[in-house]
Amino acid sequence: MPVQRKRRIKLCPLCADGVREVDYKDVNRLRRFTSDRGKILPRRVTGVCAFHQRSLSRAIKRAREMALLPYVMQ
């Protein structure tokens, strides 16, 4: 008889914090959603919802253009 496991409900960390729109100037928050090489992490890794993933990618790209975040980290 197979063992039944309860699935954990994933909750978006940004929804849990009550964040509506991600700010490109909040570099510490943006770094949590980039890899050690500076790439934007996918939703399945970070656990954010689709709305916040789009907002995060826009904010990270803006922060890169403003030189707040590097394009590539060594």
UniProtKB/Swiss-Prot annotation:
Query: From its record, what is one biological process in GO terms?
Result: translation
Q: Name the species this protein comes from.
A: Coprothermobacter proteolyticus (strain ATCC 35245 / DSM 5265 / OCM 4 / BT)
Q: What SUPFAM superfamilies does the entry give?
A: Ribosomal protein S18
Which purpose does this protein serve, as stated in its record? Binds as a heterodimer with protein bS6 to the central domain of the 16S rRNA, where it helps stabilize the platform of the 30S subunit.
- Alphabetically list the UniProt keywords: Ribonucleoprotein, Ribosomal protein, RNA-binding, rRNA-binding
Q: What InterPro entries does the annotation carry?
A: Ribosomal_bS18, Ribosomal_bS18_CS, Ribosomal_bS18_sf
How this chain assembles, per its entry, is: Part of the 30S ribosomal subunit. Forms a tight heterodimer with protein bS6.
Q: Can you say what this protein is called?
A: Small ribosomal subunit protein bS18
Output the HAMAP family linked to this UniProt entry.
Ribosomal_bS18
Q: Per UniProt, what is the name of the gene that codes for the protein in this document?
A: rpsR
Which family does the entry's similarity section mention? Belongs to the bacterial ribosomal protein bS18 family.
Single Gene Ontology MF annotation? small ribosomal subunit rRNA binding
rRNA-binding as UniProt keyword: yes
According to the UniProt record, one GO cellular component term is:
cytosolic small ribosomal subunit
